[in-house]
């Protein structure tokens, strides 16, 4: 069994949001025919996507070809829209979540849903989380690595974490809103370097901000193998112990205490990196994640995990399925 915790999906179409809300900044989808569409933001091309980004039947065909049993579906992060008026973001979230729920309902043995929330308005976010879990049946939510000027340790977000604990709703943290200009303008650096940096900052903010202390039952997964965190934990812990006046302002506990307290996906593209990741984060906390259907994703799902001579069959099964089932709070028999 292979459960892919990190995949993205969009509706085939959605309303003209600029006309709907009266201001720009929104992403629109322009279908081009022949299984291709353009994501357009304020008249500029953001990304060209293929039919597998909106058509569940195409996805299932490709899943069957690659041996993937289940995909956890989440929106494309550019759709988060945390910058917008909260009620407008809520309306978009409801549209995206309803579309996602309809796809899961059609293929409940192949897909599970990770919803999206208006995180800039925590009260509305909690209400939509309740709906996602209780009405739509989602086991989790995808959130950004920061919410406008809030890092993930901001007390404004604590009601969301409290609700997630109460509802047993898992959180999948995805980097987004990287610097795109200046020194980052060339070489795809926002995706190659910016995303790992964003994820590392998100992990550090939750650790040093005491989030895992305040919400010990919170289940959190960080995308892209936790970014640079597994490689830099030595520097982070050393800095914490050398300069507690700077690093221990909100949490006196050594960052190493929290290794094993959160999950990451496996998307590191390198056997040495995957070995380090499982050594640092724990073999019980790393889950297969591919970033399907995008080019930076793992094109052969699970191939890297299966190639690891250091991993026994029990470990490989944990990484490809068992850990995801634990993270999502689901039983294997639902998908067998």
UniProtKB/Swiss-Prot annotation:
GO terms for molecular function: aminocarboxymuconate-semialdehyde decarboxylase activity; hydrolase activity; zinc ion binding. Pfam families: Amidohydro_2. InterPro entries: ACMSD (IPR032465), Amidohydro-rel (IPR006680), Metal_Hydrolase (IPR032466). Zn(2+) binds at residues 6, 8, 174, 291. Its EC number is 4.1.1.45. Pathway: Secondary metabolite metabolism; quinolate metabolism. Induction: By streptozocin-induced diabetes. Repressed by low protein diet. Substrate binds at residue 47. Keywords: Decarboxylase, Lyase, Metal-binding, Zinc. One of its GO terms (cellular component) is cytosol. Highest expression in kidney with lower levels in liver and brain. It catalyses: 2-amino-3-carboxymuconate 6-semialdehyde + H(+) = 2-aminomuconate 6-semialdehyde + CO2. GO terms for biological process: L-tryptophan catabolic process; negative regulation of quinolinate biosynthetic process; quinolinate metabolic process. CDD domains: metallo-dependent_hydrolases. It is an enzyme of class 4 (lyase). Converts alpha-amino-beta-carboxymuconate-epsilon-semialdehyde (ACMS) to alpha-aminomuconate semialdehyde (AMS). ACMS can be converted non-enzymatically to quinolate (QA), a key precursor of NAD, and a potent endogenous excitotoxin of neuronal cells which is implicated in the pathogenesis of various neurodegenerative disorders. In the presence of ACMSD, ACMS is converted to AMS, a benign catabolite. ACMSD ultimately controls the metabolic fate of tryptophan catabolism along the kynurenine pathway. Belongs to the metallo-dependent hydrolases superfamily. ACMSD family. Monomer. This is 2-amino-3-carboxymuconate-6-semialdehyde decarboxylase. The gene is Acmsd.
């Amino acid at each position: 069994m292979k459960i892919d915790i990190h995949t993205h999906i969009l509706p085939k179409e959605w309303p003209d949001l600029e006309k709907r809300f009266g201001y720009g900044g929104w992403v629109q989808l322009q279908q081009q025919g022949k299984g291709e569409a353009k994501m357009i933001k304020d008249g500029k091309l953001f990304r060209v996507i293929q039919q597998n980004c909106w058509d569940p039947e195409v996805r299932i065909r490709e899943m069957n070809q690659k041996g993937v049993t289940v995909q956890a579906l989440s929106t494309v992060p550019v759709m988060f829209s945390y910058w917008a008026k909260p009620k407008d973001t809520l309306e978009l979230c409801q549209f995206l979540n309803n579309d996602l729920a309809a796809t899961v309902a059609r293929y409940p043995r192949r897909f599970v849903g990770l919803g999206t929330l208006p995180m800039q308005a925590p009260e509305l976010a909690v209400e939509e989380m309740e709906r996602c879990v209780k009405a739509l049946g989602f086991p989790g939510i995808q959130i950004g690595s920061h919410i406008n000027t809030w890092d993930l340790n901001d007390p404004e977000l604590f009601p969301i974490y409290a609700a997630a604990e109460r509802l047993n709703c898992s959180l999948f943290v995805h980097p987004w809103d990287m610097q795109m200009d200046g020194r980052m303008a060339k070489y795809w650096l926002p995706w190659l370097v910016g995303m790992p940096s964003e994820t590392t900052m998100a992990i550090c903010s939750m650790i040093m901000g005491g989030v895992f202390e305040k919400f010990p039952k919170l289940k959190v997964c960080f995308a892209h193998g936790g970014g640079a965190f597994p490689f830099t934990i030595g520097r982070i812990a050393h800095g914490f112990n050398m300069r507690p006046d700077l690093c221990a302002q909100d949490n006196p506990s050594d960052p190493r205490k929290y290794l094993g307290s959160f999950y990451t996906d496996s998307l590191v593209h390198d056997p040495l990196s995957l070995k380090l990741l499982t050594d640092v984060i724990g073999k019980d906390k790393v889950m297969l994640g591919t970033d399907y259907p995008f080019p930076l994703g793992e094109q052969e799902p699970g191939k890297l995990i299966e190639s690891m001579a250091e991993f026994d069959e029990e470990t490989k099964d944990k990484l490809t399925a068992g850990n995801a089932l634990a993270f999502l709070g689901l039983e294997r028999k639902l998908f067998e």
